[in-house]
Amino acid sequence: MAASHALKPILELLPEELPGEGYRRAQIAHWLYAKGARDFSEMTDLPKALREALAREWRLSEFSLVQAFPSQDGSVKYLFTLLDGKKTEAVYMPYENRKTVCLSTMVGCPAGCTFCATGALGFGRNLTAAEILDQLLTIAYHQGLSPREIRNVVLMGMGEPLLNLRNVLKAVRIMLHKKALALSPRRVTLSTVGIPKGIYRLAEEDLGVRLALSLHAPDDETRRKIIPTAHRYPIAEIMEAVRHYHAKTKRRVTFEYTLLKGVNDHLWQARLLAKLLKGLSAHVNLIPFNPWEGAPVAGTPKAGVLAFAEELKRLGVPTSIRWSRGQDVGAACGQLALKVPRPLTLTPLPEGAGR
């Protein structure tokens, strides 16, 4: 058999593009996305000759190694080694009524946000659509789930999705496809630091997914201190694109705001944020800073987080606080940095997983 990297990635294909004739394509799609098959030999209702032909030409996995690090709160950080040796991460977050995965779209990230460990890594490369999808499929396999049991996807891991839009759109289309993962568009959230051109493009694609803007400051001066690349895209320009997205899709937009001590946590900044969002169907998601080794910033104390939230609510802005999950294994928001937690805690994968 050819080495994995020499084979073609079958996860790049929409169900109607899969190899085979007619109903054989539907069978393959069912094995991939409903049953979560990780080897063509598992597809027992396909003729043996077809299974062998598929295995000679296509690969099912984009990873050479998968490591899992469980948190005390039930979430699990996954560290994936890609076929070229580069690495990326994703997080599984089980809740009482839903199962969520946080997926990466890049190796590293070019945005360089000061509060984010991923940004400190710099940019490695874009992930392919297959590499984005396989994070979800591998997590489902490891958790003993059908891929279709994971009903919430947030593209909030490593990377800026709108700077890898071609691959992200392809992956999202497969997620939404009725013969693939069959996700509801409202269950898919794409997070961006604010790339106006990408937001307009996303609106025109009209996939109906949710948009989350990593704003982190209500004014350009403060935002440039937090996000080095913010000088390229003034807040006014970003907000114009966001308002267009809302008008086009009728989807409420989430604004993510990581609170940093003495930087963006003053109550006057809460009032300025409320003014900025006036007239827009918006929800503010306040994120307490999750510490990481070498971080140049500090988080706002809990009392300050609560006060900022109360001020926004007083001004009529729907607001919630995203308290951390997975912080003990470096899986919380802003902590993904390709680091193995200490002490090392490996969750064994089923035999053959990640191959």
From Swiss-Prot:
GO aspect biological process, one term: rRNA base methylation
Positions annotated to bind S-adenosyl-L-methionine: 159-160, 191, 214-216, 290
Keyword Cell membrane: no
Active site positions: 89 (proton acceptor), 333 (s-methylcysteine intermediate)
Reactions accelerated catalytically: adenosine(2503) in 23S rRNA + 2 reduced [2Fe-2S]-[ferredoxin] + 2 S-adenosyl-L-methionine = 2-methyladenosine(2503) in 23S rRNA + 5'-deoxyadenosine + L-methionine + 2 oxidized [2Fe-2S]-[ferredoxin] + S-adenosyl-L-homocysteine; adenosine(37) in tRNA + 2 reduced [2Fe-2S]-[ferredoxin] + 2 S-adenosyl-L-methionine = 2-methyladenosine(37) in tRNA + 5'-deoxyadenosine + L-methionine + 2 oxidized [2Fe-2S]-[ferredoxin] + S-adenosyl-L-homocysteine
UniProt key word Ribosomal protein: no
Keywords from the UniProt entry: 4Fe-4S, Cytoplasm, Disulfide bond, Iron, Iron-sulfur, Metal-binding, Methyltransferase, rRNA processing, S-adenosyl-L-methionine, Transferase, tRNA processing
Domain Radical SAM core intervals: 95-322
GO molecular function: 4 iron, 4 sulfur cluster binding; metal ion binding; rRNA (adenine(2503)-C2-)-methyltransferase activity; rRNA binding; tRNA (adenine(37)-C2)-methyltransferase activity; tRNA binding
Subcellular location field: Cytoplasm
Residues annotated for [4Fe-4S] cluster binding in this entry: 109, 113, 116
EC number: 2.1.1.192
Cysteines joined through disulfide linkages: 102-333
Protein function: Specifically methylates position 2 of adenine 2503 in 23S rRNA and position 2 of adenine 37 in tRNAs.
Protein name: Probable dual-specificity RNA methyltransferase RlmN
Naturally occurring in which organism (per UniProt): Thermus thermophilus (strain ATCC BAA-163 / DSM 7039 / HB27)
Gene that encodes the chain: rlmN
